[in-house]
């Protein structure tokens, strides 16, 4: 009972984890500022964080602590330290590829000149880590301090040129090791690539080892016996030793391709072995490989395949012998007798140089391949394909794919394929097959000449065989073995397929397809067929479901075209623009009415601008692709003939009319749309306006694509235009703002794409939360958001919503104001924009008080006396003038001078005071600041009293003193007596030449010249000066005033 109880507890625990993770799906458990995509793989209990190509310069914070798979590829992170993965203890996989790609391999506009720095023990704390990808980082050596749990290590496309045993001591549990692309023509090392003897000996659990693209000159010695996959292709190995693979009895995949390559027409730097010799492989080299299933000997310059190689590898399922020199060997091929389990055989591009064979010669040994499913013989290069050429294949009951493309076949009897009932794909693409002029049942042929002529084939057509490393991965993908499918998968899924694309067929007739009634898919694209089809050409193809007639010169003169294909479901007549571009030719687009089960029709890139039939008709068609035509001509303003072109496609659900140069849609277009239309694409038309209200005509519309146009507005209220719309795509337009009630009541909307527009602001009323909560996807990146206080609600919403917004942390950014330019909307701190009433009142009050005090202090400093004067002036105007009661004068004169100027002080005391207070003459009682002011009393009060208690105020003037505040205050107080008491008490004495430009001084001299005196420079004139001063002090000023001044005062 213990075991069942333990099982029950374990099941409960697993169920609990699943429920917990499912709950996390609806809760925000990582910060939105994380610039990565976070997904959950519930069956595997994985938390996947993908930070691919996010322009990161450091590992971002906020990564969930329960992350198991972390991808940081295609960024610019310069270093890794033990703190980089702090608290990420559950990591199982780290993908850190392409953060510093070697300069020859990387982008030239963003070259990395400082290689990735990995500090010691950066990964040692990750005890659950199993997979580590460090490709494309310019590393010089294998990192040290790796955790013992590591099972996969990938170090491709670095600068590791030496493999030493001591560098691998920490990888005792490693199972997969990728060390390729560290030294080849695109990532040169300029040194000899070295592998220490027995370097891999202690890797007792190693299963997969890749040393591809490294200029390795020999198979490493003493490889682990646990290896199941060994990749040594694209190196410089010239010879395989007899014992190189002796202990690899578990090996299942061996790839030796590209050693001693065949360099003819190679689209990359290629160095053959000396004298163009083949890769030397001893006959018993593979004897120990009893479990081998895949052997690749592509481009090894082989001229002969010894049967002895395959004596002990009778489990082989895939053999690649393409791009060698085995044209003659294909006619013998005794080695095939030793391959009873072979499923896939590739003998492509083994043609003899400058030889154009009359026919293909297949060895009878092919008949022994009872398990064979795929046979590829491209690039054999021969003229005529006859039935007996394929006779060795007649009894291969499992054969499904026969690929004879790129052979430059001119004559082919297609009826021979009736004997291959189990064939699913017959590939005759990229040949020169053309029709005969008679009605014989030979099939496609040309007037053949029996002589063999010299021919140089253009074998660059198929890059699959001429790619340097067809299994190489890009920075975005880490999968290794990519499958190759030469036939259109959508065609292949229907069943037996014949591919005649890219031939020289210019005419077809029913006899060409005699005995091919079993075909389900026929590909005739890329030929020169320019005939007028009348409905008889494909009559034998009674079971045909898919016809690819693209890239020809179809002439739709008859509405009966293709009508003989009663079971046709998919028809592609794209890129048949030849006759559609000509004037005055009949085009019957209503041919569809005779195709009773047609489901999908592709008419793209035909430049259709006219049609004899006004409507297309079909009761079965569900998808119509009409891209790249000229509906702008058919729907020209004022021409209503073609507005119902699609009206009679009664079951049409998907219509693509992108790239039709439609700058506007006539009003009747929507009324002429099919009644059951669900998906409508109007992308890339240059639309400047759109009649949103007309969407009411499309009652079932679910998806509307208006991307890549020039629209500037959205509907006032989307729900008033369509109640069925679920997906709206408006990316790449010129939309600057959203209407106030844009999504009001649009509860059915699930997907909205507003990316790559010029939207600056999104208001709450435009995005009601009860609608947004129903959205599954919202795209807002690459807009021009203004992150002002008006965006408070939007910033708050994106931080709290559970709607998926791709690129939120990286590409939903601000264009302004300056402080926020380039900053992510999600990371904005708009605390200062909170509209709290108390905060607003306190802020307004404090700023008002501060401004008031600042203004008052400034005004008091600059305009005190002006304000004081204006105040009293206004007061006098209102209340009338009242003479101030002043005490009797105590002094004859108050002397105002610059007490800080020693020269002036000396003149006042030695000259002026001595002359005016001399008891021998008539003396005057003078008031001096330094002598008569009361100590401790404010300066302003002393000054005011001195002026009030003196009959006259004498100003001893210098240029320097005239600019001081003391002079200005004293002068204003003295002048105030003129305003209040109408008494002029001012006398000016200039010790320096007076200011000639002073208007006040010039006016005073004219009106009261006796009050303005100058100290003469001639000593003889001094007595006259003193006499004038005494007269001015002794006499009232008004006596000396001019008549004009008296009247003014």
Curated annotation (Swiss-Prot):
Q: Which GO terms fall under biological process for this protein?
A: canonical NF-kappaB signal transduction; cellular response to mechanical stimulus; cellular response to virus; defense response to virus; inflammatory response; innate immune response; JNK cascade; positive regulation of canonical NF-kappaB signal transduction
Q: Which cysteines are joined by disulfide bonds?
A: none
Gene Ontology MF annotations: double-stranded RNA binding; pattern recognition receptor activity; single-stranded RNA binding; siRNA binding
Q: Which residues are glycosylated?
A: 66, 69, 167, 202, 215, 361, 413, 488, 523, 534, 590, 679, 720, 799
- InterPro entries in UniProt: Cys-rich_flank_reg_C, Leu-rich_rpt, Leu-rich_rpt_typical-subtyp, LRR_dom_sf, TIR_dom, Toll_tir_struct_dom_sf
The chain's Cytoplasmic topological domains, given as residue ranges, are: 861-1049
Coarsely, its chief localization is endoplasmic reticulum
Q: Where are the LRR repeats?
A: 43-64, 65-87, 110-126, 127-149, 151-170, 171-195, 203-226, 228-247, 248-275, 289-312, 314-337, 339-368, 369-392, 396-419, 421-443, 492-515, 516-540, 541-564, 566-588, 595-618, 619-644, 649-672, 674-697, 698-721, 723-745, 746-769, 772-795
Q: Where in the cell is it found?
A: Endoplasmic reticulum membrane; Endosome; Lysosome; Cytoplasmic vesicle, Phagosome
PANTHER family per UniProt: TOLL-LIKE RECEPTOR 7, TOLL-LIKE RECEPTOR 7-RELATED
Domain commentary: Contains two binding domains, first site for small ligands and second site for ssRNA.
* Similarity field: Belongs to the Toll-like receptor family.
Instruction: Give the protein name, as stated in the record.
Output: Toll-like receptor 7
């Amino acid at each position: 009972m213990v075991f069942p109880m333990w099982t029950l507890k374990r099941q409960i625990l697993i169920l609990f984890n699943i429920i917990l993770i499912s709950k996390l799906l609806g809760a925000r458990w990582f910060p939105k500022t994380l610039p990565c995509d976070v997904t959950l793989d519930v069956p595997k209990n994985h938390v996947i964080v993908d930070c691919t190509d996010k322009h990161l310069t450091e590992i971002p914070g906020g990564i969930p602590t329960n992350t198991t798979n972390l991808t940081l590829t295609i960024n610019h992170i310069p270093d890794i330290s033990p703190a980089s993965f702090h608290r990420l203890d559950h990591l199982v996989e780290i993908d850190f590829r392409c953060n510093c790609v070697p300069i020859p391999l990387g982008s030239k506009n963003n070259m990395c000149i400082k290689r990735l720095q990995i500090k010691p023990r950066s990964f040692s704390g990750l005890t659950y880590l199993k997979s580590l990808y460090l490709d494309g980082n310019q590393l010089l050596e294998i990192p040290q301090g790796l955790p013992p749990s590591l099972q996969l290590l990938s170090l491709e496309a670095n600068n590791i040129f030496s493999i030493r045993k001591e560098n691998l001591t920490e990888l005792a549990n490693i199972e997969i090791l990728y060390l390729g692309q560290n030294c080849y023509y695109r990532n040169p090392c300029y040194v000899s690539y070295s592998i220490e003897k027995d370097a891999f000996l202690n890797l007792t659990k190693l299963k997969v080892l890749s040393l591809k693209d490294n200029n390795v000159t020999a198979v490493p010695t003493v490889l682990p016996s646990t290896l199941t996959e060994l990749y040594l292709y694209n190196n410089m190995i010239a010879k395989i030793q007899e014992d190189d693979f002796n202990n690899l009895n578990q090996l299942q995949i061996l790839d030796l391709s590209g050693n001693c390559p065949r360099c003819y027409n190679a689209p990359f730097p290629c160095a053959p072995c000396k004298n163009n010799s083949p890769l030397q492989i001893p006959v018993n080299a593979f004897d120990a490989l009893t479990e081998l299933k895949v052997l690749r000997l592509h481009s090894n310059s082989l001229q002969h395949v010894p049967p002895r190689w395959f004596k002990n590898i009778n489990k082989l399922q895939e053999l690649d012998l393409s791009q060698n020199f085995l044209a003659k060997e294909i006619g013998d091929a005794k080695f095939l007798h030793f391959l009873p389990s072979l499923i896939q055989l590739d003998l492509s591009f083994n043609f003899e140089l400058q030889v154009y064979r009359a026919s293909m010669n297949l060895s009878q040994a092919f008949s022994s391949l009872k398990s064979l499913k795929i046979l590829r013989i491209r690039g054999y290069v021969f003229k005529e394909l006859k039935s007996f050429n394929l006779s060795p294949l007649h009894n291969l009951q499992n054969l499904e794919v026969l690929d004879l493309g790129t052979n430059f076949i001119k004559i082919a009897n297609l009826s021979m394929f009736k004997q291959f009932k189990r064939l699913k794909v017959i590939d005759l693409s990229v040949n020169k097959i053309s029709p005969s002029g008679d009605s014989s049942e030979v099939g496609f042929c040309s007037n053949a000449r029996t002589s063999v002529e010299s021919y140089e084939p253009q074998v660059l057509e198929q890059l699959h065989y001429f790619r340097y490393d067809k299994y190489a991965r890009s920075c975005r993908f880490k999968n290794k073995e990519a499958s190759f499918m030469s036939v259109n998968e959508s065609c292949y899924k229907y069943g037996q397929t014949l591919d005649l694309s890219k031939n020289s067929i210019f005419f077809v007739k029913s006899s060409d397809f005699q005995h091919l009634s079993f075909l389900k898919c026929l590909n005739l694209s890329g030929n020169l067929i320019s005939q007028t089809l009348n409905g008889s050409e494909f009559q034998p193809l009674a079971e045909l479901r898919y016809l690819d007639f693209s890239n020809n010169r179809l002439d739709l003169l008859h509405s009966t075209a293709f009508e003989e294909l009663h079971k046709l479901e998919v028809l592609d007549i794209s890129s048949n623009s030849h006759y559609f571009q000509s004037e005055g030719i009949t085009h019957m687009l209503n041919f569809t009415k005779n195709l009773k089960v047609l489901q999908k029709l592709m008419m793209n890139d035909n430049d259709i601008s006219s049609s004899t039939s006004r409507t297309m008709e079909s009761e079965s068609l569900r998808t119509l692709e009409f891209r790249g035509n000229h509906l702008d001509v058919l729907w020209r303003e004022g021409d209503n003939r073609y507005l119902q072109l699609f009206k009679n496609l009664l079951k049409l659900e998907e219509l693509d009319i992108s790239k039709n140069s439609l700058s506007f849609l006539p009003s009747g277009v929507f009324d002429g749309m099919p009644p059951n239309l669900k998906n409508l694409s109007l992308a890339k038309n240059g639309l400047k306006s759109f009649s949103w209200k007309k969407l009411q005509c499309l009652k079932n519309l679910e998806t509307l694509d208006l991307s890549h146009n020039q629209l500037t507005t959205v509907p006032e209220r989307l729900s008033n235009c369509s109640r069925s719309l679920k997906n709206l795509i408006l990316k790449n337009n010129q939309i600057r703002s959203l209407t106030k009630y844009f999504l009001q009541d649009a509860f059915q909307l699930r997907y909205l794409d507003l990316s790559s527009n010029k939207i600056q602001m999104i208001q709450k009323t435009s995005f009601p939360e009860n609608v947004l909560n129903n959205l599954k996807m919202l795209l807002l990146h690459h807009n021009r958001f203004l992150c002002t206080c008006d965006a408070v609600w939007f910033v708050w919403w994106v931080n709290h919503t559970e709607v998926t917004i791709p690129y939120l942390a990286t590409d939903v950014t601000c264009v302004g104001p300056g402080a926020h330019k380039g900053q992510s909307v999600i990371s904005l701190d708009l605390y200062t924009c909170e509209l709290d009433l108390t905060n607003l009142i306190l802020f307004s009050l404090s700023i008002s008080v501060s401004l008031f005090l600042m203004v008052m202090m400034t005004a008091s400093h600059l305009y005190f006396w002006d304000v004081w004067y204006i105040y009293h002036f206004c007061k006098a105007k209102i209340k009338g003038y009242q003479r101030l009661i002043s005490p009797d004068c105590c002094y004859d004169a108050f002397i105002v001078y610059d007490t800080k100027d020693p020269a002036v002080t000396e003149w006042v005391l030695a000259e002026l005071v001595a002359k005016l207070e001399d008891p021998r003459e008539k003396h005057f009682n003078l008031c001096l600041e330094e002598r008569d002011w009361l100590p401790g009393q404010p300066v302003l009060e002393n000054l005011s009293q001195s002026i009030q208690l003196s009959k006259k105020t004498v100003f001893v003037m210098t240029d320097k003193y005239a600019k001081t505040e003391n002079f200005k205050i004293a002068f204003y107080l003295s002048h105030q007596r003129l305003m209040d008491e109408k008494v002029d008490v001012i006398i000016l004495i200039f010790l320096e030449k007076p200011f000639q430009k002073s208007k006040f001084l010039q006016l005073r001299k004219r009106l009261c010249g006796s009050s303005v005196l100058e100290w003469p420079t001639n000593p003889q004139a001094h007595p006259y000066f003193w006499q004038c001063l005494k007269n001015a002090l002794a006499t009232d000023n008004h006596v000396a005033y001019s008549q004009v001044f008296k009247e003014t005062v």
